[in-house]
Amino acid sequence: MFARDTPTKSVQKGAFAADREPPTVETMTTDAHRSRPLRFGLHTALPRGTEFSTFANSVQDAGFDVLTIPDHLVASVSPFAGATAAAMATTHLHTGTLVLNNDLRHPVDTARETATVAAISGGRFELGLGAGHMKSEYDAAGLRFESGRTRVDRLIESVNVIRPLLAGEPVDVDGAHYCVRAEAGELVAPPGVHIPLLIGGNGTRLLQLAGRVADIAGLAGFSHNRDATKVNLTHFDAAGLKDRIAVVRDAAGDRFDAIVLNALIQFVVRTDDREASAAELAAAFGGISPEFVLDSPFVLLGTHEQMAEALVERQRQFGVSYWTVFDEWVGRASAMPDIAKVIALLR
């Protein structure tokens, strides 16, 4: 998940079958989801050099709970180094990856880096994992870009390596993609703290994996075509989010109550005229209506008071308690100033 992945052009609205009834609030989420304290994350990739520590402190002072960093082969902050720098510069801000491209590292290396950041930060780190999707980055680095099924298969095996290593347990994985055998504590020094695992994306198999093993299910609201040249708004409206949460729920079974639901808000617009701003966004997207934009849980429009009310209502409706917004990037202003004011209203 990254600022340049957001749906600003070449988008296709997903078609929903007329006879498909979205899950109701009562059956989709539980009181555990609707009663959790709201958490807020800021997602940044902008290189700031020696000013990064100052920036991390400003994020903490603004009331955010988490500073997350993406994992793309572009001129941006690298995820583990950035997370470590942010943790060292702050006192209670959590850091994390949103999300690591599993194909860029061996899972043993991912576990080693994760354990180190978690130990240094005193447990203020959450590990977000994904299957990778930007074909252009694979091509530029000379990496083979395989099918989505293969990439998710590889992520599943990777998780089966990473989790026991971080827990200080022996690992014995002999799969199609990884073969790792080690005694407890042999390859990775366990950090001695629980590291929340976030599995993020929009695809069904990814979210099923989140339901089975993750502490946090990260919901993006959209997907890409095979080479990531088009964004498909398949689950960008209320019915779509409910559908994706239902996938997590069905895979989770009895552990669903314990899973934190996270959503990545793609656009934050401070405005006194929500309808006009929705029309502007719809025109920028192309092929969707202002009503579709207003219905999207992944868009936040209005005054700061309206935004605060909307987030409270969305937690009631969807059970999402952890909301992430974007920092500045090329062509995009940071959502931090507006969301800082929203956070102040909610706390």
Language-model features: locations:
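Accessible peptide chain termini
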Residues: 1-2, 28
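Cationic, amphipathic, low-complexity segments that mediate targeting or membrane/lipid association
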Residues: 2-8
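Active-site-adjacent structural elements that line small-molecule/cofactor binding pockets in enzymes
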Residues: 12-14, 19-347
